[in-house]
Amino acid sequence: MANSMNGRNPGGRGGNPRKGRILGIIDAIQDAVGPPKQAAADRRTVEKTWKLMDKVVRLCQNPKLQLKNSPPYILDILPDTYQHLRLILSKYDDNQKLAQLSENEYFKIYIDSLMKKSKRAIRLFKEGKERMYEEQSQDRRNLTKLSLIFSHMLAEIKAIFPNGQFQGDNFRITKADAAEFWRKFFGDKTIVPWKVFRQCLHEVHQISSGLEAMALKSTIDLTCNDYISVFEFDIFTRLFQPWGSILRNWNFLAVTHPGYMAFLTYDEVKARLQKYSTKPGSYIFRLSCTRLGQWAIGYVTGDGNILQTIPHNKPLFQALIDGSREGFYLYPDGRSYNPDLTGLCEPTPHDHIKVTQEQYELYCEMGSTFQLCKICAENDKDVKIEPCGHLMCTSCLTAWQESDGQGCPFCRCEIKGTEPIIVDPFDPRDEGSRCCSIIDPFSIPMLDLDDDDDREESLMMNRLASVRKCTDRQNSPVTSPGSSPLAQRRKPQPDPLQIPHLSLPPVPPRLDLIQKGIVRSPCGSPTGSPKSSPCMVRKQDKPLPAPPPPLRDPPPPPERPPPIPPDSRLSRHFHHGESVPSRDQPMPLEAWCPRDAFGTNQVMGCRILGDGSPKPGVTANSNLNGRHSRMGSDQVLMRKHRRHDLPSEGAKVFSNGHLAPEEYDVPPRLSPPPPVTALLPSIKCTGPIANCLSEKTRDTVEEDDDEYKIPSSHPVSLNSQPSHCHNVKPPVRSCDNGHCILNGTHGTPSEMKKSNIPDLGIYLKGEDAFDALPPSLPPPPPPARHSLIEHSKPPGSSSRPSSGQDLFLLPSDPFFDPASGQVPLPPARRAPGDGVKSNRASQDYDQLPSSSDGSQAPARPPKPRPRRTAPEIHHRKPHGPEAALENVDAKIAKLMGEGYAFEEVKRALEIAQNNLEVARSILREFAFPPPVSPRLNL
C-alpha cells in the first residue's frame, strides 16, 4: 500500500523490475532511519525545482498521452503550484526575508519533496516509454497517483502559506481534541518527522504493530515525504473522526472495508463501478481530491447510472449506515458482504455549552434564548460548525448545504467539520444569591420551577429591584460578546460574577413564536436581525472605524410631552419619578449598537430596536414555564400587545425586511459608524407621520393595545424630510454609560414581552427567517447597511417566500440601493474580509464568553415604552445650542475621565462629529471599556 501511494513502480509492470525493488529497499531504509536533514531552500533551489516542474508539464502535454481534463489534472496543478511559489517569493523579496524563508523548516521540506516528485515523474516517462500512452497500464496509473500527490501538495502549500504568507504555526486544526493533541506534543510546529509523530500518537492511541504503522503512514502522509504536517494531520482527523476512536474508525473504514479505494480519482471510480452497472447498490468510497478532508462515495443507482456524492455533516460510517438503510450503499466494490459499521456509532459525549448569566439575561431582554437557532428560530442549536464555531440546528445547516451554500452560513468560513453540541440552559438557582437572575421562559422546561414558586417570586423581585437601580449603573448590560463558544471540556465555565457584560452573546429573534402569534417573548421584539443586532462586534478586538463623511448636526429635539397622569398602564412604565413614556426615548447606542451598531445605518437601527424591542434592564418575567409571572398582569400583557407594531416596523426597516436573527450569528461588520446626523435623515419621516408624532407620544398610555404602530402606508423615507422632523437628535440616556433608562423611563419586563410580535410575524416570516442564511453571492461591503431605518417598508413589501424550503433562496440584489431601499441579506453580505477583521469575528456569535472582569452580571435597566415616531425618540437630548456649542476639549476630558485613551476619544468624537453620546457609544463598542462598577447582590 505504501508503495502504491508513493507512486513507486511496484516492480512487476515497470521498465526495470530489479531497479524498482532496489529503490523500494532504499526507501524502506530511509523510512526506518528517518528523513535526512534538508538543505536551505534558497531562490536558486526553488528555480531549479521550477525547471523540473516545467519539464514534467511538457512531457504531460504530449498529445499521445490524451490526459483528461478532470481532477487531478496535472497540467493545471503544476502551473498553479508554480504561481503560488512565485507569490510566496514575492512576499519574501528582500534578502533578510528570503533568508528567513529559506530556513523555514516546512518550506525546505516542501521544496525538497517537490523536486523529488518532479524527478520521479520524469523518470516515469523515461522508464515507461510507450506504456505511458496506454490508459490502462500500470505506468499510467503511477502517473495518476503522482498527479494526486501534486494535488495534495498544492492544497497543503496554499493552507500553510495563504496569500503567500507563512501561517503554519497558526494553522487551525478542525477537531478540538486533535488540536489539543498536536499542541501538547508538537506545540506550534508545522511539520514533524513520521517517526516522531508515530511515537507521540502511540502514547494516545496504541498502534498494534509495525505493519499497522506502515498502513497508517500511507493514509496520513498524503504528500508522501516521510513527514506529517499539521495540514495532513487535520485532514486525517476529519476523515476518520471522532478523535477518541480514530484508529478504530480507520481500521474499519480504510484497512478492512472492501469499499475503500486509496488514491483513486473521479474517473477511476466511474470506471471501476462500470462493471457493476447492473448491480444497483454497488459502491466504493475514496478521499475527495478536490475537497480534502471529505469523502466521496460513488454508487450505482437503480437505473444503472453511476453517481458520486460527498456526505455533509456526518462521519463516513454514519453516511454509509444511512445509505445502506436507504438502499443506496449495499455492495462494497460489488461484493455481497456489506460490513456492519453500527459498532462505530457508540454515542460520543457532546460538547456542552453552558449559558452564562450575562448571556441568559441578554437573551431574555431580547425575547429569546441562547439555545434557539438564529436561522429558523424554531429549533434549538444542536450542531457546531468547525473550525469557526458558529452554532445552529442541523436542519438549517443541511438545508443550507443542499442549496449549494458555500461555507458557514454566517461567516463563509470553510466548513471543515461539524460537532454535535448541547446547550445547557442557565439555571438561576445554580447562581445562588450572588446575582439577579431572570427566568428564561424558553428554557423553563429544563428548569422546572413548578415546585419552587417561592424561588420564582424571589427572582422576580430581585429582577425588579435591579431594574430600579439601573440608573446608577455605569455600563449597559447589552454589550457584545467577548469570545467564541467553548465547550465545557475545552474551557472551564467562568464565574458568572467574573464575566464582563462585554462578552454577552448576540440575540436571536423568536420567529417561531411570532409566526404563530404566541406571546412568549419575555421582553418583546425579536426585531434584531443579525444585520442590525446591537451585540455583534467584538469590542476589544475591533479597531475604531474610519470616520464617515461629515453631515450636518441634527437640530434639537422637540420638547418632551407633558407628563401623563399615572394609571395602571402608566405605572408599569414608570419605576421612578423622572420617568416618561419610554417610547419617546430610544435605546442608548451603547446598549443597542454594541460593536456592530455603527455600520452606517446601524445606530439608527439600534434606536428603533431599542424602542420597540426588549431593552437591557428588562428581563423575562412575563412567561415562566409557560405561565405569566407574578410581576405581570393582564393589563401588562395588553400593554405588550400594543408594542408589537413599531418594533416590527423597525425590524423590517432594519434591512429591508431582514431582521436581527441574521446578525446574531454573523461575524461582526467593521463598517465605520456614521455620525448621528448620518442616521437622522434615515429616520426622518413624511409629513403625515411627523405631524402626528408628538400627539401619538402623548397618547401612548391611553391608547388601545393593538393601536401602536407606525402606519405602513407612510414609509419612512430619506427623501421626505420636513422641517419639523429635523428635530430628531440622537437618543439621550439618563445614564451616559449606555443604560436603558431613556428619559428616565422604565418599562416593565412584561410590557416589552410582546411588543413586536404582530408586525414581526409579517417580516420575519416573509423575509428574515430565510435571509439568515446568506447567499453564496459575494457579500457587499459593510456600508451596505445604510438603510437600517432609511426605508420603512409596508408589511406586505417582502418579496421572499416564507416557506421553510425557501430559507436559502438568494436575493436578486446583494447590494444596498439607497434609492430603492434595498438592503443586502444579512448574514453574509459583507466584504470577504469583514468577517475576519476582528480576532474572534468568525466565531463570536452564539458562543460562550471566555473572558471575565470580576464584575457581577450588570443590573438590567428598565424597559422604556416604545417610541411612536422617529422625531420624538430623542426627548431628553440637550437642546440644539447647548449641545452644538459644547466645548470639544471638555468632551474629550469627560470621556478620558471615563477611562478611555486620548487617541480613541479624539477619533470617536471625530466620527461622531463631536456628539458626546455617540462618541461614548463608539468607545464602548470599539475601545476597551472603563471598569464596571459591581452590581448589588439582591
Swiss-Prot record:
What are its GO biological-process terms?
CD4-positive, alpha-beta T cell proliferation; cellular response to hydrogen peroxide; immune response; intracellular signal transduction; negative regulation of apoptotic process; negative regulation of CD4-positive, alpha-beta T cell proliferation; negative regulation of epidermal growth factor receptor signaling pathway; negative regulation of T cell receptor signaling pathway
- Which spans does this entry mark as compositional bias, Low complexity? 794-804
Print the keywords alphabetically. Answer: Calcium, Cytoplasm, Diabetes mellitus, Metal-binding, Phosphoprotein, Repeat, Transferase, Ubl conjugation, Ubl conjugation pathway, Zinc, Zinc-finger
Q: Where does the UBA domain lie? A: 887-926
Where Phosphotyrosine occurs along the chain? Y363, Y664, Y708, Y845
- Composition-biased stretches, type Polar residues, lie in 473-486, 714-724, 839-855
Name the segments for region: Interaction with SH3KBP1.
847-883
Give the Pro residues compositional bias ranges: 544-566, 775-784
| Enzyme Commission no | 2.3.2.27
**Which Pfam family is one of those matched by this entry?**
Cbl_N2
Q: Which GO terms describe its cellular component?
A: cytoplasm; glutamatergic synapse; membrane raft; plasma membrane; postsynapse
Class of this enzyme: transferase
Region annotation (Interaction with VAV1) maps to 543-567
Record region (SH2-like): 241-343
Per the record, what about its domains? The N-terminus is composed of the phosphotyrosine binding (PTB) domain, a short linker region and the RING-type zinc finger. The PTB domain, which is also called TKB (tyrosine kinase binding) domain, is composed of three different subdomains: a four-helix bundle (4H), a calcium-binding EF hand and a divergent SH2 domain. The RING-type zinc finger domain mediates binding to an E2 ubiquitin-conjugating enzyme.
Function according to Swiss-Prot or TrEMBL: E3 ubiquitin-protein ligase which accepts ubiquitin from specific E2 ubiquitin-conjugating enzymes, and transfers it to substrates, generally promoting their degradation by the proteasome. Negatively regulates TCR (T-cell receptor), BCR (B-cell receptor) and FCER1 (high affinity immunoglobulin epsilon receptor) signal transduction pathways. In naive T-cells, inhibits VAV1 activation upon TCR engagement and imposes a requirement for CD28 costimulation for proliferation and IL-2 production.
Question: What remark does the entry add?
Answer: This protein has one functional calcium-binding site.
Q: Which disease is it linked to?
A: Lack of Cblb expression is the cause of the Komeda diabetes-prone (KDP) phenotype, characterized by autoimmune destruction of pancreatic beta cells and rapid onset of overt diabetes with no sex difference and no significant T-cell lymphopenia. The KPD rat is a spontaneous animal model for human type 1 diabetes mellitus.
Q: What is this protein called?
A: E3 ubiquitin-protein ligase CBL-B
